[in-house]
C-alpha cells in the first residue's frame, strides 16, 4: 500500500494539474502549488495593488482642501499646514504617475521633517493627514529603536505595525504613512563620526536610511526576535511616505551661533527675544545646523522637505480647548451629556488652564491632563450627578475651590409650574 501511494503522481492542490503538466511543483505542509498558480497569484496581487493605488489617487484632495480639513483639527501652524498639504498631494500624484508607466521624468519621493516644540501639533498633523487620505498610518517612537542585533526594537517593526494597520494588505500598506516621533533623540553624540558603536543614535539613523529611501524589506509578521523561524512578508517601501518629527531642543542656539558669526562688532552679542528665537530664528534653519545637532548627512538627505512649527501662545491654547472638531472641552462636555449631566467651563477658567500649560511647558499636549485632574472627582461620582451641572471657574483651576455643582432646571419643569399656576386661578 505504501509503495502504491509513493507511485501516485503528485498534483497541484489548487488547479489539479499533474506534475508532468507543469514546470515546477512546490511542496508545502500536505499541499502542493504549481508555478502557473504562483504566477496567477502574483498577477492578482499586482492588479489589487493597482486598484488600491487608483482608489487613493482618484480621491486625493487638492492642497487647499487638505489645508482646509487640517484647519478643522489643528490650530495655527499655517506655514507647516501649507507645506504638508503640498508635499502629501505631490507624493500621491507621483505614485499615480509612476503607476501609469511614464518614465520620461523620474520623480523622487519627498519625505518630511517637522521641527517644533513639545505639544505644538506635529503628531496631530500627521494623524489628521492619514485620516483625510484614508491610508494606513502608524507611529513609532525613535527612542525605542536600536540597531539590529541589540536590545530594543528593530526598524522592521515599524513596517510590521504599518502592515497591521493595513490588516496585512500589502498593497495598501505600501501606500501608507509612517510617523517617527522624537527623531531628534537619535542624533549622534558628537558632530564627528563615532569611533565606538552608537547603537541607539547614529546606528538607528543608518538602519532607517534604506527603508526611507525605498527598498523591499523582509518584515516578520510576528516580530523579528521571538519567532526567528517564521516566513517573511516582502514590503516595498518606495511609496511609503515617512514623516519625522522632533523638538530639537538647543538647535536655536546652533542657528544663532552660525548667524552671529557673520555679524560685525557688538551687534552679534545683542540679546535675542525668546519669542523671536522660536518664531524667527528657526526660519533660518540650514542643513549644516541639523548636521551639527547630530543628524548624519545621509539621513538629512532622505528628508528633503523641512518645516518648523511655532510655540503655541495662550490665545492658541484657548482656541485648541474649544474650537476644533475634536476640541478637548467638547469631548468632556459630551462625556457628561452621556450621563445626563452638564459641564460648563467659564472663559476665565479656559485662560487659567492655558496659562497652566504654558507654565509647565507642555503645550497643547498638557491641556487634557490638566482638565482630567480638575474633573477627576466629578467623573468618579458621575452617576450621582444626573440632572446636575458641573461648573469650572478660574478659582477651581487655581485650586482654591472645588468644581461648583448645581441642579439643572429644565424648560419642561418651568412649563409645568406655569401650567399648575394657571390651573389654580379661579374661573
UniProtKB/Swiss-Prot annotation:
A single Gene Ontology molecular function, please? ATP hydrolysis activity
Taxonomic placement: Bacteria, Pseudomonadati, Pseudomonadota, Alphaproteobacteria, Rickettsiales
Task: Quote the record's binding site residues for ATP.
Answer: 117-124
Q: One matching Pfam family, short form?
A: ClpB_D2-small
Q: What is this protein called?
A: ATP-dependent Clp protease ATP-binding subunit ClpX
- Its biological function? ATP-dependent specificity component of the Clp protease. It directs the protease to specific substrates. Can perform chaperone functions in the absence of ClpP.
Q: Ranges for the ClpX-type ZB domain?
A: 1-53
Instruction: Please name the PANTHER family in this protein's record.
Output: ATP-DEPENDENT CLP PROTEASE ATP-BINDING SUBUNIT CLPX-LIKE, MITOCHONDRIAL, ATP-DEPENDENT CLP PROTEASE ATP-BINDING SUBUNIT CLPX-LIKE, MITOCHONDRIAL-RELATED
Keyword annotations of the record = ATP-binding, Chaperone, Metal-binding, Nucleotide-binding, Zinc
Q: How does this protein assemble?
A: Component of the ClpX-ClpP complex. Forms a hexameric ring that, in the presence of ATP, binds to fourteen ClpP subunits assembled into a disk-like structure with a central cavity, resembling the structure of eukaryotic proteasomes.
Sites where the protein binds Zn(2+): 12, 15, 34, 37
One Gene Ontology cellular component annotation held by this UniProt entry:
HslUV protease complex
The family this protein is said to belong to: Belongs to the ClpX chaperone family.
Amino acid at each position: 500500500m505504501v509503495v502504491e501511494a509513493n507511485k501516485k503522481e503528485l498534483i497541484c492542490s489548487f488547479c489539479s494539474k499533474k506534475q508532468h503538466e507543469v514546470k515546477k511543483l512546490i511542496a508545502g505542509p500536505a499541499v502542493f502549488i504549481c508555478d502557473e498558480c504562483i504566477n496567477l497569484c502574483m498577477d492578482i496581487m499586482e492588479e489589487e495593488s493597482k486598484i488600491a493605488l487608483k482608489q487613493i489617487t482618484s480621491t486625493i484632495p487638492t492642497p487647499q482642501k487638505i489645508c482646509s480639513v487640517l484647519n478643522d483639527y489643528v490650530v495655527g501652524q499655517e506655514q507647516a499646514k501649507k507645506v504638508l498639504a503640498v508635499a502629501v498631494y505631490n507624493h500621491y500624484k507621483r505614485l499615480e504617475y509612476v503607476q501609469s508607466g511614464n518614465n520620461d521624468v523620474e520623480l523622487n519621493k519627498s519625505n518630511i521633517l517637522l521641527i517644533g516644540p513639545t505639544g505644538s501639533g506635529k503628531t496631530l498633523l500627521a494623524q489628521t493627514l492619514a485620516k483625510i487620505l484614508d491610508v494606513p498610518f502608524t507611529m513609532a517612537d525613535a527612542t525605542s529603536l536600536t540597531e539590529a542585533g541589540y536590545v530594543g526594537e528593530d526598524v522592521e517593526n515599524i513596517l510590521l505595525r504599518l502592515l497591521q494597520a493595513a490588516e496585512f494588505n500589502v498593497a495598501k500598506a505600501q501606500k501608507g504613512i509612517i510617523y517617527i516621533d522624537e527623531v531628534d533623540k537619535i542624533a549622534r553624540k558628537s558632530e564627528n563620526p563615532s569611533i565606538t558603536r552608537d547603537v541607539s543614535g547614529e546606528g538607528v539613523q543608518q538602519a532607517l536610511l534604506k527603508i526611507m529611501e525605498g527598498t523591499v524589506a523582509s518584515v516578520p509578521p510576528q516580530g523579528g526576535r521571538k519567532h526567528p523561524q517564521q516566513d517573511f512578508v516582502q514590503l516595498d517601501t518606495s511609496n511609503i511616505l515617512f514623516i519625522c518629527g522632533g523638538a530639537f531642543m538647543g538647535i536655536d542656539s546652533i542657528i544663532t551661533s552660525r548667524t552671529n558669526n557673520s555679524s560685525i562688532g557688538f551687534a552679534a552679542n545683542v540679546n535675542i527675544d525668546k519669542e523671536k528665537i522660536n518664531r524667527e530664528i528657526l526660519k533660518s534653519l540650514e542643513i549644516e545646523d541639523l548636521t551639527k545637532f547630530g543628524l548624519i548627512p545621509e539621513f538629512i538627505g532622505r528628508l528633503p522637505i523641512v518645516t518648523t512649527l511655532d510655540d503655541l501662545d495662550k490665545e492658541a491654547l484657548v482656541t485648541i480647548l474649544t474650537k476644533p472638531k475634536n476640541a478637548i472641552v467638547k469631548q468632556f462636555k459630551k462625556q457628561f451629556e452621556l450621563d445626563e449631566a452638564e459641564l460648563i467651563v467659564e472663559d476665565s477658567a479656559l485662560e487659567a488652564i492655558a496659562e497652566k500649560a504654558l507654565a509647565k511647558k507642555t503645550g497643547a499636549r498638557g491641556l487634557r491632563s490638566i482638565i482630567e485632574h480638575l474633573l477627576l472627582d466629578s467623573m468618579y461620582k458621575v452617576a450621582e450627578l444626573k440632572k446636575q451641572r458641573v461648573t469650572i471657574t478660574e478659582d477651581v483651576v487655581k485650586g482654591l475651590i472645588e468644581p461648583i455643582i448645581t441642579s439643572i432646571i429644565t424648560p419642561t419643569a418651568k412649563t409645568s409650574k406655569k401650567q399648575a399656576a394657571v390651573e389654580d386661578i379661579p374661573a
